[in-house]
Design a protein with these regions (language model features):
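Short acidic (Asp/Glu) and glycine-rich catalytic loops that position anionic groups and cofactors
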Residues: 44-48, 100-106, 131-137, 231-233, ...
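Active-site phosphate/pyrophosphate-binding segments
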Residues: 88-214
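Hydrophobic alpha-helical scaffolding
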Residues: 15, 53-58, 82, 100, ...
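Long, well-ordered, tryptophan-enriched scaffold segments
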Residues: 30-37, 42-130, 326
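Catalytic, metal-anchored helix/loop core of enzyme active sites in primary metabolism
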Residues: 277
Length: 331
């Protein structure tokens, strides 16, 4: 488990959680004596019964490369799976074995970076090749420079084992998060309003907001493509707070001064509101009638208004409708 599966965090979900089933699933794991390895800087990032491998933050890819090197050089790789279900392994192998850059990504190389002993890396490589193995990567690993690499490497490692698609094997991202990723729950579609088609196809990865604001017009790579950062003059932010989840907040605070105008919908005087030129006060869930649907539970919950909206606060849909009317594009 890269990044672990924190039992406390798994009880929290946007939109709420009703069943709270993860503890029961963790217990089933322990009852079956399944070996859980928590690879994380924090020991608490895993359910009870897990073994802990403390790792230097941000070095998960190096650790996985060390395992991959052992699998390749000890011929523990599922060659048939790689041949039939993947593309590009031979090019990856040139990098892994050092034929491309002169540096084999062996266990000793990985130990110097990630802090986990070469002996442990070799032992894990043999163990996961001999048993049914599920590799999980927490969502948190993406929130770093080159944050996509652990996910690419974990997928590569799972492909080398050849267990993708087998019961209890393969690869999983975000297991245990938001109340049940990975649990066998049948969801149904949510209630939505009709929406038009966005004529703008450009986008940036969410973790590059500060970089975009600081470097308009510069190039960046994403999923093998070269893109260009736009020159943003106005930000209108609703339904979230970039100062809650963005990395390097001091850098973001300085970058946030670049645009000419910043507008936000918010219900409290938080960091985003304090750094906005215009704040449109919106209601909380206690000030409107609504419907709640949890993302991982098959439930619809009726939400009855408890109090009238405070002051001039309006719900987000009323705000959007009012703006659309002023712009002459109200549906």
């Amino acid at each position: 488990m890269f990044g672990g599966i924190n039992p406390n965090n798994s009880k929290v979900s946007m939109g709420g959680s009703t069943r709270h089933e993860n503890d029961a699933w963790f217990k089933k794991f322990n009852d079956k004596n399944i070996n859980l390895i928590n690879i994380s800087p924090q020991k608490v990032d895993a359910p009870s019964g897990s073994s802990w491998l403390p790792i230097v933050p941000g070095t998960d890819t190096a650790f996985m490369l060390g395992i991959a090197y052992e699998l390749e050089t000890k011929d523990l790789v599922d060659r048939n799976f790689l041949k039939n279900y993947t593309v590009g392994y031979e090019k990856f192998k040139l990098y892994l074995t050092g034929q491309k850059d002169g540096q084999p990504k062996n266990a000793e190389w990985a130990e110097k970076i990630c802090g986990i002993s070469a002996e442990t890396i070799r032992s894990i490589a043999v163990k996961i090749s001999q048993e049914r193995t599920l590799i999980t990567v927490a969502w948190s690993l993406q929130r770093a420079q080159n944050g996509e690499q652990p996910y690419w490497m974990a997928t590569t490692l799972a492909s080398m084992l050849g267990q993708i698609g087998l019961p209890g094997g393969g690869i999983g991202f975000g297991y245990g998060a938001i109340g049940g990723v990975g649990n066998p729950i049948k969801n149904f579609g949510g209630l939505t309003f009709p929406k038009g088609k966005n004529p703008i196809s450009d986008f940036i990865p969410v973790a590059r907001i500060a970089e975009m604001l600081n470097s308009p017009g510069s190039n960046y790579e994403f999923n093998g493509e070269e893109r260009v950062y736009p020159d943003i003059k106005l930000i209108y932010w609703c339904g979230g707070n970039p100062f809650h989840h963005h990395q390097d907040l001091n850098r973001l605070i300085k970058a946030w001064e670049k645009p000419d105008t910043i507008i936000s919908n918010d219900w409290c005087w938080n960091t985003l509101a304090k750094r906005s030129d215009i704040v449109l006060p919106c209601t909380t869930s206690l000030e409107r009638n609504d419907i709640m649907m949890t993302p991982r539970d098959p439930y619809v919950v009726s939400m009855s208004k408890l109090v009238d909206p405070y002051g001039q606060a309006k719900n987000d849909f009323e705000i959007f409708k009012g703006i659309a009317k002023k712009m002459g594009v109200e549906a």
